[in-house]
Amino acid sequence: MTSYTPTYRIKVAGQTVTGATLSGLTITSGRNDIYTQPSAGYCNLTLIETALSSVDYEINDAVSIEVTNSSGVYVYLFGGFITDISITVATSSTNVITQRINIIATGALARLARAIYTGNLSSDFDGDQIDFIISQLLFDKWNELSSSLTWNTYDATTQWQNAENNGVGEIDTPGDYQLDSQNNLNGSIYSIASQLATSGLGYLYEDSQGLIGYADSTHRSEYLSQNGYVDLSGNDAIGPNLQIQKKSGDVRNSITIAYGSAGNSTVSSSDATSIGLYGSLASTITTTLKNQSDAQDQADYYLDIRAFPQYALPRVTFQLQSPEIDNTDRNALLGVFMGMPVNLSNMPSNMNGGEFQGFVEGWTWTASMNRLQLDLIMSPVAYSLQAFRWTSVPAAETWNTISPTLEWLNATIVA
């Protein structure tokens, strides 16, 4: 049994909000499934104001939401920029007026959607192309700096590579796939970067501070092999909201990959067994892959992991103030991120054998003064990693080459 009461810290334009009281908070991040690139994070925040203090917030002001963890240390839940502000009289009397200040903010990916890139892209790996394209917006150019800026007033601890960085986070460079060159581009930076990420079998994301990152095709498997799963118990989740789901819409048994600068070349792969069971469920994925061999590898990869349906976990809910959640699990949940590997045990035995292993795709925080709820959306591990089938293991493999401490649940990621 552990005691936990969340304490929140809200900053607007770098200044901590001190007078108003948090009334309600909803934060949504990530995506609903593995098939699309994520949209911008969304924050809906309500403050209660009783002193008629001046409200100096402005559109595009930076906003961050933090909460204390089990050790009392503040950790980030959200970072973004204000898009809407409203002030409403909630109650009034002769002596007291109570107001609701509602702030809506979006994450940094929204900035990519409203910025246009015109120009060319030279052939390069996926991570390098994405790093280039988003840096056009999120790094200030030399002539964009204030003319009154002087060297002795600049932060002396800033590294040159991150100077004037307005939102670029961790980008996996160079990436795993060589992409073709593109000429005469004219579109939103978000749509261009999303296409590049899909071409590289990766995804864009926002971290908890609002920085934009890119995870390449091997990011999840590398993280899992180095850090393992976050182990959580279904006993700590809210039972009525725990759900697993298997859908025919998740099956892909005939894959066509379009590749090249204009997507005019194609390769295909299909699974006769899956087609015999479920009928032909075809999908065409347009990429800018440069090499035919990479396109064929991707077609085979999609087929390996999606020819047969797997249970996903579209919702599981945790109340972080619950004394049943220990401090280790609570802190892990507070650090949730897109691609976090989770092993959820102690589920009902008729739900996927009582255990689910997956990656977090999206999440929603719902908060009030003394309450903090987290809803997770998870995809099965098999949709992100190429799990070996027994017959696919090399014939020359011997038992004494496998780590004696390897657990069966982790064997799917060991070649």
Please give the residue ranges for each predicted region:
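Short regulatory "switch" loops immediately downstream of catalytic or recognition motifs
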Residues: E49, I65-N69, D84-T91, W142-L145, ...
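Short coil-to-beta-strand transition motifs
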Residues: S71-F81, P348-F359
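Generic structural motif
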Residues: P6-I10, A20-I27, V63-I65, Q159-P174, ...
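Short linear interaction motifs
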Residues: T26, T83, Y177, L185, ...
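Acidic, small/polar-enriched beta strand-loop surface segments
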Residues: M1-T18, N120-G127, S191-Q357, W365-N370, ...
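Charged- and aromatic-enriched interaction segments used to assemble
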Residues: S71-Y74, T91-K247
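Beta-strand-rich assembly/attachment modules of structural machines
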Residues: M1-D128, T366, R371, I377-L385
